[in-house]
Amino acid sequence: MAELTISAADIQGAIEDYVANFATDTEREEIGTVIDAGDGIAHVEGLPSVMTQELLEFPGGVLGVALNLDEHSIGAVILGDFEKIEEGQQVKRTGEVLSVPVGDGYLGRVVNPLGQPIDGRGEIETTDRRALELQAPSVVQRQGVSEPLQTGIKAIDSQTPIGRGQRQLIIGDRKTGKTAVCVDTILNQRQNWETGDPNQQVRCVYVAIGQKGTTIASVRRTLEEGGAMDYTTIVAAPASDSAGFKWLAPYTGSAIAQHWMYDGKHVLIVFDDLTKHAEAYRAISLLLRRPPGREAFPGDVFYLHSRLLERCAKLSDELGGGSMTGLPLIETKANDISAYIPTNVISITDGQCFLETDLFNQGVRPAINVGVSVSRVGGAAQIKAMKEVAGSLRLDLSQYRELESFAAFASDLDATSKAQLDRGARLVELLKQPQNSPMPVEEQVVAIFLGTRGHLDTVPVEDVQRFEQELLEHVRSSKEEIFTEIRESKKLSDELEKTLTDVVNEFKKGFETTSGESVVPDENVEAMSEDDVEKESVKVRKPAPKKK
């Protein structure tokens, strides 16, 4: 066995070396104590240096946000599982504000308001982060709305057009098709995405606030089937989430979208819906004992939405020329758009599309009320071809609605009024559109051209949609150059209009109504020339489909 020898000199040298390299390293850490907790809110004692909107760390890695800074305590919103937060637990400062990871890794994913994936497809690889509370672009950092954002919905693109960088409110009662309008708009961006041109591509962010889980799953499935998830991110705060998550969700979606906007890209963001967002913020404010105002909402509920929607903008060329277009949704009760939250958001946005229950129940879908709907800045972004054909559409429909109510009481009408009623009925039928079937703008121009130029006046109302579909199919198959010219030039020249009129008139000769009649009035038959004698001519008419 080896003998153990201890050298006093070695021990002395080790101690001297340790003392020479010793440095006092003190850490200052503020620790608070939970004095009460419940309903997603916690009051914390201590932490005298905490800042508003600062992240706090509760036991178990649960995060909270400091909202109320009182003299002796802090009111914090707990983000996540608040059931395990108890009185007496310690709370630490983080010195950070809320931020989320951002980047192209989010495309095609479903995340929660903290930016964490919840679709079971693994982690999201990102390198950048962005704070949730950021100042909106200033006046000098913006430019006017000039590029169209096509929704693929005839009634919107023709009457209340939307431009890139605009905020267009979609408002209406529950079950009137608000979400369907936004989903169709996202689906319509697929053609632009497939071009691969960054100037045409539009990335989409769908923020679901307080929606049922089945509704969010249905939207995701629709987008996947339409090939739209390749360029879409879903931020989900379902009804089962705490009020804190519902309050944060729109800001998370905006942070993800703003990253792309400042990178020179174009983004469409949908907030579905801001009524539930305001209600979640009201719940938080009341639990924090903030003084209630009108309808028990806190005094800063206007600022809650204005600072969110002001982030939507068309940036100046110096900042890359990116854009963020916002489609906030608001749910009304009994079509009352003069309530507190609806009037707030109407005053913030650049226009609104009002969806009406009565129209929806009559089968007019999308159920857009032309009289109340307006787009304040989108007209500058509308393509010239659509401006030319849809110029009188809004007036015609407004006159039709007015005459329709009058005609219910009048026994006889003059010829002009009858003509307006007949054309109005056909225009209403023309603007109907099935869900999840957005239409390219060049096809919309041709369809609206049929109605406003009087080509449908001889077509029975029940045959209008079939006439439109068969004509568009005819143009696609034999006169594709019409669509190509409208798509590329974005104009309807006199020559093109004449060509289109000739195509429509020729098509009408072979179209049969459901009752088997022609839509072309009979003309006086001229005498047959000698050259045509003993010659055969065959005319093919496409029969109307049999009624089931």
UniProtKB/Swiss-Prot annotation:
Keywords: ATP synthesis, ATP-binding, Cell membrane, CF(1), Hydrogen ion transport, Ion transport, Membrane, Nucleotide-binding, Translocase, Transport
Organism of origin: Mycobacterium sp. (strain KMS)
UniProt keyword Transport, yes or no: yes
Compositional bias annotation for Acidic residues: 523-534
Matching CDD domains: ATP-synt_F1_alpha_C (cd18113), ATP-synt_F1_alpha_N (cd18116), F1-ATPase_alpha_CD (cd01132)
Family per record: Belongs to the ATPase alpha/beta chains family.
Main localization (coarse): membrane
Enzyme class: translocase
Membrane topology term: Peripheral membrane protein
Site (Required for activity): 373
Function: Produces ATP from ADP in the presence of a proton gradient across the membrane. The alpha chain is a regulatory subunit.
Pfam families to which the protein is assigned, alphabetical: ATP-synt_ab (PF00006), ATP-synt_ab_C (PF00306), ATP-synt_ab_N (PF02874)
Enzymatic reactions: ATP + H2O + 4 H(+)(in) = ADP + phosphate + 5 H(+)(out)
GO MF terms held by the record: ADP binding; ATP binding; proton-transporting ATP synthase activity, rotational mechanism
Protein name: ATP synthase subunit alpha
